[in-house]
């Protein structure tokens, strides 16, 4: 019967998996066999032969035994893809061709990146801040004005008007008129002196955070400029009251102070010859009150500088905190990515193991089918049948039966090659022997005839003499 197959012996020879005159080991229904591949692609063993290069066939004497079996070829060399698995299923009977079932590799499902909790918290905080900003009205200017004019009118107006940005927004005039309504309406006018600093033009900004930042920056710049003005005023007043020194540092400092236009304005506006020298309550005629006034001014300047430094330190601390938070977020992201990669690797390993288990299960099922088929057909390969070349009949096992783990265990020595039937090689040897025998017989007959001829000629010569 023809064992219809997808892979033929000729294909295996073409691929280089098997070669002519190569010993082949295979198993059928748990029984191991050995054979030799001939030049035409046939496999001959003791009682079992696979013939016909286009199909794997074997001759059955007796009933048709249907079932499944595996042929395992060992010692074959070829491409690595074909070299990994040398198991070929074949079917006994003429019911149809085998279709190879190729299992699709299950691609490991990549886990979808879940949003990180830190990013969600940041987004929620931003949304809450935006809602709070939308709910709060922008009453910064009104609040600043109300806080400013709660103070007494006798205090310095330059320190009071720092937090108000109305004059910066307009930038047209330095004179301001503000009205405060109480039980008795009073109008107070404050004149600002022309200051040498340049005013920063304010751009229209809709974001309230940026407005607050600009206000803080403007306040800081104003405080710095005022502190510089106070220091320059004090230096000028000290130079006027101190005797002239001969040191080169004093000469250079006076030259630098007189060269700048700002110092000239300050000197002219706050000097002893100016009209505004009584604005700060300084009496230049009395020597007793001058050092106290200077000390008070120094203290005020130091306080302003300290406030500026504190603000700068706060800003630096905020920046450092932000940087630390960013670094922590980056580290968390890296750790999450590493965990995801390790999970992917584990999934791949699990999938590979599952595939291996599935293949093993298929092989086990195939073996079970073999046993079931043999049991379902009691007439096939029964002890009374003529199936003498197969190993299903355990009562009468064949002489060439080997252990079941013959092919799977590569450490066992190969069994002896069984006696092969009459082949072309033995025919040629017999023919050569026959030819040699015939030639020897002919040569012997020729030598005998020659000796007979010589003896006859000798006898004739003797008779003539």
Swiss-Prot record:
Residues 156-169 have a biased composition (Acidic residues). Residues 443-465 have a biased composition (Basic residues). Residues 95-377, 392-465 are annotated as: Disordered. Keywords: Coiled coil. It comes from the Eukaryota. Residues 208-220 have a biased composition (Basic and acidic residues). Residues 214-242 form a coiled coil. Residues 264-294, 392-407 have a biased composition (Polar residues). Residues 6-91 form the RAMA domain. Pfam families: RAMA (PF18755). The keyword Coiled coil applies. Residues 117-137, 177-190, 226-263, 295-376, 424-442 have a biased composition (Low complexity). This is Putative uncharacterized protein DDB_G0272516. It comes from Dictyostelium discoideum. The lineage of its organism: Eukaryota, Amoebozoa, Evosea, Eumycetozoa, Dictyostelia.
């Amino acid at each position: 019967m023809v064992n219809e197959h997808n892979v033929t012996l000729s294909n295996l020879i073409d691929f280089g998996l098997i070669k002519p005159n190569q010993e082949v080991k295979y198993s059928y229904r748990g029984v191991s066999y050995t054979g030799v591949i001939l030049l035409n692609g046939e496999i001959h063993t003791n009682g079992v032969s696979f013939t016909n290069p286009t199909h794997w066939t074997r001759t059955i004497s007796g009933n048709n035994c249907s079932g499944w079996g595996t042929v395992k070829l060992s010692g074959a060399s070829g491409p690595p893809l074909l070299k990994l698995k040398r198991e070929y299923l074949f079917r006994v009977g003429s019911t149809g061709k085998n279709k190879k079932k190729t299992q699709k590799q299950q691609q490991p499902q990549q886990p979808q990146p879940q949003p990180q909790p830190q990013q969600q918290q940041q987004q929620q905080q931003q949304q809450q801040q935006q809602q709070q900003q939308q709910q709060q009205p922008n009453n910064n200017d009104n609040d600043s004005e109300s806080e400013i004019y709660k103070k007494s009118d006798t205090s310095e107006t330059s320190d009071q008007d720092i937090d108000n940005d109305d004059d910066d927004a307009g930038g047209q005039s330095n004179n301001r008129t503000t009205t405060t309504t109480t039980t008795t309406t009073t109008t107070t006018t404050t004149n600002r002196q022309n200051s040498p600093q340049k005013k920063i033009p304010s751009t229209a900004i809709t974001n309230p955070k940026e407005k607050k930042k600009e206000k803080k920056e403007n306040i800081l710049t104003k405080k710095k400029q005022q502190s510089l003005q106070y220091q320059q005023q004090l230096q000028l007043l000290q130079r006027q009251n101190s005797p002239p020194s001969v040191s080169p540092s004093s000469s250079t400092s006076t030259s630098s102070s007189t060269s700048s236009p700002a110092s000239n304005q300050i000197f002219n506006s706050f000097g002893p010859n100016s009209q505004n020298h009584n604005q700060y309550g300084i009496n230049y005629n009395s020597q007793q009150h001058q050092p106290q006034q200077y000390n008070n001014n120094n203290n005020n300047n130091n306080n302003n500088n300290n406030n500026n430094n504190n603000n700068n330190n706060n800003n630096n601390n905020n920046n450092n905190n932000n940087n630390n938070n960013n670094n922590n977020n980056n580290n968390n992201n890296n750790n999450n990515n590493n965990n995801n990669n390790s999970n992917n690797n584990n999934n791949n390993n699990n999938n590979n193991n599952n595939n291996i288990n599935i293949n093993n299960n298929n092989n086990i099922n195939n073996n079970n089918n073999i046993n079931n088929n043999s049991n379902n057909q009691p007439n096939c390969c029964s002890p009374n049948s003529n199936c003498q070349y197969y190993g299903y009949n355990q009562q009468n096992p064949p002489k060439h039966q080997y252990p079941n783990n013959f092919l799977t265990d590569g450490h066992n020595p190969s069994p002896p090659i069984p006696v092969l039937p009459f082949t072309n090689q033995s025919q040629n040897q017999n023919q050569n022997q026959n030819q040699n025998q015939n030639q020897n017989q002919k040569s012997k007959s020729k030598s005998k005839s020659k000796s007979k001829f010589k003896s006859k000629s000798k006898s004739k010569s003797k008779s003539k003499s």
